[in-house]
Amino acid sequence: EGILTSATLMTNTPGFEHAVKLSKENPDLGVGVHLVLTFLKPLRDDVPSLVDENGNFYRPDAYRSGLAIVDSDELYKEWDTQIQKALDAGIEPTHLDSHHHAHTFNERHFDVFVKLSEKYDLPIRGNAEYDHSRTTTTYFEPAFDGVGLLEKKEQEVYLDTLFNRIKENDATEIMCHTGYIDEFLIKSSSFTDPRIYQVDILTDSKFVEKIRNDKDIELVTFRDL
């Protein structure tokens, strides 16, 4: 059902086991590892440069302000542990990316990210800021998160424009944040209602029909690129 083909998994969250179960129930879904540096706690306890006085990851603002400066070796160890946890759970990752695009905060983070992608021979996404030669698609659509908040006519215009972009490019990635609202999401994220709207648009809409009925459009995962 729907046209979503790829997801990405955070290994340090309470929903990890549930996500692994869903992945195994949907073997055609591409699943990447969503490397975490800015949410909850690390998996390791020997990475002091990554955490605040409470043992939590620093938030993104700490990196923007210069308060948080990670040790590259510690970041490598933590992200490597996150990837290994996914592998140990039976996940065969299709790609690497990161929460809050943490791998693009600076070149130090990006270098660690690239080293891990090479170690595990995995594509990387969300990296055009530093290395265009490593991009995985020819077009990246960053504005889909707001589609559910548009008025009906504006939404139709946006989706028609997006469809044309898909037709014009060899490979298109539409970044989305689909989901259902529960207590944990409400407490941990300010991005809630738009997730439900995205589910509807990606499963039951004229946009879905147009994508499915176009013989020139193929739905793929990062494994296919």
Question: Locations of the language-model features?
Answer:
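Active-site gating loops and adjacent loop-to-helix segments of metal-dependent hydrolytic enzymes
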Residues: K41-A68, S190-T192
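C-terminal domain-boundary segment and adjacent tail
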Residues: I124-R125, S188-L225
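Catalytic domains of cell-wall/extracellular-matrix polysaccharide-remodeling enzymes
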Residues: S72, D80-T138, P142-E156, N164-K167
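Acidic (Asp/Glu)-rich catalytic clusters
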Residues: E1, A19-G30, D45-N56, L87-D88, ...
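Aromatic-lined glycan-binding groove of carbohydrate-active enzymes
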Residues: D121-P123, A128-Y130, D160-T161, R165-D182, ...
